[in-house]
């Protein structure tokens, strides 16, 4: 499986994402600069965290106009797995691929620490390696991770089982403690916590590794034929 890691001005988690794929999974991965216009030849797309374009105007608001973003939308529409982490999640929201918006954390402070996540849905290609209701430890690093949506959108997320992860505690004011959601089709996941920073016990937790392993396993089950 071959992954693309999108690199934007201000990205700072692209190297971590690259490491998780190449060194922990042993899969192919390449950096793709924001001025590129095609993601042909890639099987999965990773939009990492950081402060794209300085987070001016609004987190992800400028990044959505980058040359590479139509290709990201195309990959999502084609059913390829697309993962947006932290700022990457915010960008996917700005693109309209995922619903909702991010507001300032409820205490107006930047949060940077490991947190408890609860796996709400383990029937996605990102979470199939977990157990439903499983508690995992994954770090967060955000100042604007307070997920917000209106009541109709929330009802739809619940009805369609699109809530992938919730926080064990209300760390930032997110509606229903939402930490990660998928699109209706289930091939796009946006999450504020950083699974790429939790792929080795030396980092304090390896709980994020199952997420990447799930992506690869589901892709192989679909695309690789064994005799």
UniProtKB/Swiss-Prot annotation:
Annotated GO MF terms: ATP binding; glutaminase activity; phosphoribosylformylglycinamidine synthase activity
Gene Ontology, cellular component aspect: cytoplasm
InterPro entries noted in UniProt: Class_I_gatase-like, PRibForGlyAmidine_synth_PurQ
Annotated TM spans: none
Pathway(s) per entry: Purine metabolism; IMP biosynthesis via de novo pathway; 5-amino-1-(5-phospho-D-ribosyl)imidazole from N(2)-formyl-N(1)-(5-phospho-D-ribosyl)glycinamide: step 1/2
Pfam family of the protein (one): GATase_5
Domain named Glutamine amidotransferase type-1: residues: 3-225
Catalysis: reaction(s): N(2)-formyl-N(1)-(5-phospho-beta-D-ribosyl)glycinamide + L-glutamine + ATP + H2O = 2-formamido-N(1)-(5-O-phospho-beta-D-ribosyl)acetamidine + L-glutamate + ADP + phosphate + H(+); L-glutamine + H2O = L-glutamate + NH4(+)
Annotated active site: 86, 194, 196
SUPFAM superfamilies: Class I glutamine amidotransferase-like
EC number(s) from the headed UniProt entry: 6.3.5.3, 3.5.1.2
This protein's UniProt keywords: ATP-binding, Cytoplasm, Glutamine amidotransferase, Hydrolase, Ligase, Nucleotide-binding, Purine biosynthesis
Localization per Swiss-Prot or TrEMBL: Cytoplasm
Matches recorded under HAMAP family: PurQ
Protein purpose: Part of the phosphoribosylformylglycinamidine synthase complex involved in the purines biosynthetic pathway. Catalyzes the ATP-dependent conversion of formylglycinamide ribonucleotide (FGAR) and glutamine to yield formylglycinamidine ribonucleotide (FGAM) and glutamate. The FGAM synthase complex is composed of three subunits. PurQ produces an ammonia molecule by converting glutamine to glutamate. PurL transfers the ammonia molecule to FGAR to form FGAM in an ATP-dependent manner.
Subunit structure: Part of the FGAM synthase complex composed of 1 PurL, 1 PurQ and 2 PurS subunits.
NCBIfam families recorded: FGAM_synth_I, PRK03619.1
Name of the featured protein: Phosphoribosylformylglycinamidine synthase subunit PurQ
Source organism of the structure: Bacillus pumilus (strain SAFR-032)
């Amino acid at each position: 499986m071959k992954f693309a890691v999108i690199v934007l001005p201000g990205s700072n988690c692209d190297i971590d994402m690259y490491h998780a794929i190449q060194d922990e999974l042993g899969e192919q991965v390449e950096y793709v600069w924001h001025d590129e216009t095609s993601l042909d030849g890639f099987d999965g797309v990773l939009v990492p965290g950081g402060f794209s374009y300085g987070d001016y105007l609004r987190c992800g608001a400028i990044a959505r106009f980058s040359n590479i973003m139509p290709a990201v939308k195309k990959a999502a529409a084609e059913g390829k797995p697309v993962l947006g982490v932290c700022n990457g999640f915010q960008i996917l929201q700005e693109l309209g691929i995922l619903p909702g918006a991010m507001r300032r954390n409820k205490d107006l402070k930047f949060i940077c620490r490991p947190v408890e996540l609860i796996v709400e849905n383990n029937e996605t290609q990102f979470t199939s390696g977990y157990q439903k209701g499983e508690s995992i430890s994954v770090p967060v690093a955000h100042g604007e991770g307070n997920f917000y949506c209106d009541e109709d959108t929330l009802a739809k997320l619940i009805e369609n089982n699109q809530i992938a992860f919730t926080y064990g505690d209300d760390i930032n004011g997110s509606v229903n403690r939402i930490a990660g959601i998928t699109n209706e089709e289930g091939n796009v996941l946006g999450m504020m916590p950083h699974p790429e920073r939790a792929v080795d016990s030396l980092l304090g937790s390896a709980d994020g590794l199952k997420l990447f392993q799930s992506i690869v396993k589901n892709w192989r089950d679909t695309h690789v034929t064994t005799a």
